Regions:
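Short beta-strand micro-motifs in enzyme catalytic cores
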Residues: 42-44, 71, 110-114
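Core segments of cupin and vicinal oxygen chelate
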Residues: 10-56
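Short glycine-enriched loop/turn motifs at secondary-structure junctions
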Residues: 3-5, 66-69, 108
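Vicinal oxygen chelate
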Residues: 13-19, 75-119
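Short glycine-/small-residue motifs
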Residues: 123-126
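N-terminal beta-strand motif that seeds the catalytic metal site of vicinal oxygen chelate
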Residues: 1-20, 73, 130
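A short acidic/small-residue loop/turn micro-motif
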Residues: 105-106, 129-131
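Long, continuous compositionally biased terminal/linker segments
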Residues: 44-88
Length: 131
């Protein structure tokens, strides 16, 4: 079993009400299928089904004072077709400022991605690349 180099991602959001449905649509498409947290509490999120140390966890914490910034979280997928498919999920789920899917040769020769923001304007990306 390979080790996940990240323990977790803890993204701040201004409002659970704004983003929960978006992440409930997006995260399972990226392999985060086990949900944590609930309607009450300070955080919510999902993990992959692997055991530790391979488990990946993406959480979000409600912080009404949070201000989105230029940081971006990028998710890697296996194929360009997955980028296309997840781009459609993002549109249906209420993603904002969607760019692509498209080739982005300014990053690398085979960089193919969709760039977008969640409903709280946090920057995200889904990318396929082989180098």
């Amino acid at each position: 079993m390979s080790r996940n180099p990240f323990s977790h991602i803890d993204l701040r959001v201004r409002s659970f009400a704004n983003v929960t449905g978006f992440y409930q649509a997006l995260l399972p498409e990226l392999g985060f299928t086990v949900w944590w947290g609930g309607e009450e509490g300070e955080w919510r999120g999902a993990s992959t089904e692997e055991s530790f140390p391979g488990k990946a966890f993406f959480g979000f914490t409600e912080d009404p004072g949070h201000r989105p910034n230029a940081s971006c979280i990028a998710f890697w997928v296996n194929t360009r077709e997955e980028v296309d498919r997840i781009g459609e999920v993002v549109k249906r789920a209420g993603g904002k400022n969607i760019e692509g899917p498209a080739d982005s040769p300014e990053y690398s020769r085979d960089y193919y991605a969709v760039f977008f923001e969640d409903p709280d304007v946090n920057r995200l990306e889904v990318v396929h690349r082989t180098q």
